[in-house]
């Protein structure tokens, strides 16, 4: 389609100084000089002013930082791109060293209010602007002076003027289509009614030269409808046919197929979806239905993935089992009382809990390699000596597995500490402390959060140990476990939803959950946290999984473990990097002006917390910086959530004591609560990038060979080690998220062959040293995963 050229006879608006208008009716921004004179506010701070224009995409302009003052003076000139209709935003920010800069107050100013009566020029007077906090309270003032001559805007036909003074009775031409005065909207600032356009010429005139409708063009109101403004300037709509009003703009578009509009006894409009037999107050649109379908599809996919989670992998030795078949003369059986798997050796007529393919019992009859010797400690524990390297180890060199004494349950002590053994002990505690009969919980699918709250909180907490009998209203039937599993999924999806303001995501790209310090906006939040504590305890006691999990530091709190600096990496990488810099450098050589205080923002209000008594007067030095780091880390995970955490633990302990969980570490607790899923190694390998390695490097080949040899439990532990969570995203490994957004798993060559591997969970990165053999790689990786915190251990 040929482009339409503007008419050469197009008139220019008054006061435009002869500058031709653009076809879309907007003015080309020109430079305006803003002199920031001074400011005054109620609290001394290191502050600066940031200026932006809504008609410019340039970076914000900033003044210099003024130190520790309540009345900073700048007298600095800043140039911004703006026209007469621009809105200039001013932000007074407090400079921070470790955290993001905090906004103390802000203000907005329309240039049209300054140039309206001055023929487009500024009066060069001082403008006193009030600075408002996020709660709209005044915190101070800012004095500024404007100079320059902003470009004036030429009005196109059909585009509504922004001020009453810009209204004109002259007809104008755009794209060769003339508009009459009756087709234009009135330009008065306030009016009780606003008539809908009655001519198609107005719509045509509102089009730009490219054929795009003008900004702000609205759909024509249906017959019998009228738009009005209330006393606060808010739009509402009057239906003269039914003599009713509504805040929602009526549409001339027909309802989607299967929908019907009805009115309740009070005359309110609602909509019936005959497809799903549901109702809603909101008028359905094609976009809304499409978004709902996408949400439903995503939820169904998440539900499907959740149903595939498991806690312990079933040892069904299929043909494609990476461990291969059992040795000749061996058989796997199941204990009918505990359902625990054991192995029978028909050759010597013995039984054992260990899988002979992984525990090395076949290799124990083979001779030791040259230069090796086996000895025993005074307690009878075997160990091995390598006379060539003059080292000792508890690992049998023939199998690579530890050999140790028998524990209290007849298996090796190393095996006693395995995840399976811990689960068996925990399940024994739950079984021996269960209560006879069942407890019935009846809820509605449409109100599962509140219904479950009423059911759980009105029952005696000990009764929640009974066998669960879940029933959804209108869905009569027997619950043999499937309904309970669905209830745990649906309810966990609701109670952990950040929309309720009880929990919040750990970061922009970290969807693990932590308690929201601002949860007090809900007056009953402590009761809800007690309810959630009971619910989480029920999930663990009855062996059910929840939809989403918490941060690792929260699991450590549940286990009463000390939170350390490394734990902050997953939650806030910026603070972690800052504290690591302080830890690794001599801060006495640079004037950082750090004190034992922490500033933070809560619901728009800036607060200061003393890390120790008199912290505002205690400077951080090289001598006391470790104490500062320790106190800051502890404060970071406890700020504003002490009462919520206490309520959560109160609810949890009312079902069963947290001491029962002391068998597990924080990673195992996450597996116990959220379950694990089959890890697709092929998908993982396809979505991996390499640094200083190539996909064909022998270390990379060994790594994937080792991953394929692992069972699902150990793969989940490896996934926790490198990404911080045992769960694979719904879209697979291609959807892995890092601290800065989507970030694929990465293997990087770092260190020497005697180093342990390191993980960076914020970046989904594994630092893999250049090991010389497959056995060395397996030994180092296994040690790093099982015996370390996962970062920085060498």
Curated annotation (Swiss-Prot):
The active site is at 762 (glycyl thioester intermediate). E3 ubiquitin-protein ligase which accepts ubiquitin from an E2 ubiquitin-conjugating enzyme in the form of a thioester and then directly transfers the ubiquitin to targeted substrates. Ubiquitinates klf-1. Required for diet restriction-mediated lifespan extension, acting in concert with Kruppel-like factor klf-1 in the intestine to perhaps modulate genes involved in lipid metabolism. This is E3 ubiquitin-protein ligase wwp-1. Keywords: Repeat, Transferase, Ubl conjugation pathway. Residues 460-794 form the HECT domain. Residues 17-27 have a biased composition (Polar residues). It is an enzyme of class 2 (transferase). It comes from the Eukaryota. It catalyses: S-ubiquitinyl-[E2 ubiquitin-conjugating enzyme]-L-cysteine + [acceptor protein]-L-lysine = [E2 ubiquitin-conjugating enzyme]-L-cysteine + N(6)-ubiquitinyl-[acceptor protein]-L-lysine. It comes from Caenorhabditis elegans. GO terms for molecular function: ubiquitin conjugating enzyme activity; ubiquitin protein ligase activity. Interacts (via WW domains) with Kruppel-like factor klf-1. Interacts with ubiquitin-conjugating enzyme E2 ubc-18. Residues 10-124 form the C2 domain. Residues 1-16, 161-186 have a biased composition (Low complexity). SMART domains: C2, HECTc, WW. GO terms for cellular component: cytoplasm. Expressed in neurons localized in the head and tail of adults. Residues 1-31, 155-198 are annotated as: Disordered.
